[in-house]
Regions:
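Cys/His-clustered metal-coordination modules, chiefly Zn-binding fingers
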Residues: 233-324
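Interaction interfaces in information-processing and related assembly proteins
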Residues: 2-268
Length: 324
């Protein structure tokens, strides 16, 4: 990947002053819930400078990158996945990838979305039509991929991803994605929140919370309706994550502020970055393995340099024909 540098000194100063690009994972309610809160401001700013899209396309792709990052906590061991959103609307959708090592990359399907009038809000539903959301997982060492597909229901990336978990994996999951622009169309804050109910815990574990928040069935503890309502209310009380990070908020203050009564425990912190495995050497090998007709067409071109753009990260490679 050829990483482009952010040149805006005012934006760079802002990015250096806010909470770091970090995901904080936690468990709460004696293990009945797990969550992850991610400050994605650095990640989506690198995406924005790399792709150089317009504000609308940048907003969609920023949300897509954050959505892919929020899938990383659901990975089992070493794994890669692809999140694809195909719609009949003007935006067409996106295709993004994430890896358990902590990278995200990908692209929007329509890089110049037609709009009929100036944007009045960041409601993206008018640009998403009917379609499908697909998650394909590639576990390390497995010879086959595992794919889950759901119909797009809300035309909202976060809500449709929650719907995917409920329908395809039968897990209640709440997702919040937020991106904040300033008056100059710069991303000054961005983040994502993932909260998921876990299977019932074993009977040997004695809940530390009050008894009315738990039920015991067949020797297993599970969340009562009261606990579910309280957790849902707490999650829905989350402020705008884009604004939270833009105003120098941090992860732990928000986690403990929202969920203190459920005794959250931080399980890990990790970085998630925009990275791509493309390289000049890989693309030279790609060109060498083209079909005979394609190679002859390249030879016939007057230019002595072949220019190739990576579709996952927008890196532009210039390859001398002599290198091929």
């Amino acid at each position: 990947m050829i990483r482009k540098e952010i040149q805006d000194t005012e934006l760079l100063a802002h990015l250096s002053s806010i909470f770091k690009n970090e995901m904080t994972g936690f468990v709460m309610a004696d293990g009945l819930y797990r969550g992850a809160l991610f400050n994605a401001t650095d990640l989506v700013n690198q995406m924005a400078v790399q792709w150089n899209h317009g504000p609308l396309e940048t907003m969609i792709l920023a949300q897509a990158y954050i959505a892919a990052a929020l899938l990383i906590p659901s990975m089992k061991g070493k794994e890669q996945l692809q999140l694809r959103y195909d719609t009949e609307g003007p935006a067409a959708g996106f295709c993004v990838e994430a890896d358990s090592t902590g990278y995200v990359r990908g692209y929007i399907l329509q890089d110049q979305i037609p709009i009929e009038k100036p944007l009045e809000s960041w409601d993206l539903s008018p640009f998403f039509g009917e379609g499908r959301l697909k998650v394909t997982r590639f576990p390390e060492g497995s010879t086959e991929a595992f794919t889950g597909i759901v119909e797009i229901r809300y035309k909202n990336i976060a809500k449709d991803l929650s719907w995917y978990f409920l329908q395809s994996e039968q897990i209640n999951t709440a997702i919040n994605i937020s991106v904040q622009f300033d008056s100059k169309a710069r991303i000054v804050g961005a983040g994502g929140f993932f909260l998921q109910a876990l299977p019932n815990i074993g009977g040997k574990i004695k809940p530390k919370l009050t008894k009315e928040l738990f039920l015991k069935k067949n020797g297993l503890f599970e969340a009562s309706e009261l606990l579910k309502e309280k957790v849902e209310h707490a999650f829905s009380s989350c402020p705008s994550l884009g604004q939270w990070y833009a105003e120098k908020g941090n992860n732990e203050d928000l986690i403990f502020g929202l969920f203190r009564e459920f005794n959250p425990v931080v399980a890990y912190t990790r970085s998630i970055n925009f990275e791509c495995s493309c390289s000049k050497e890989r693309l030279i090998d790609y060109v060498r393995n083209l079909g005979r007709q394609e190679i002859e067409e390249l030879k016939a071109q007057k230019d002595h340099v072949i220019e190739i753009t990576c579709h996952n990260c927008a890196s532009v490679y210039k390859i001398n024909k002599d290198e091929v």
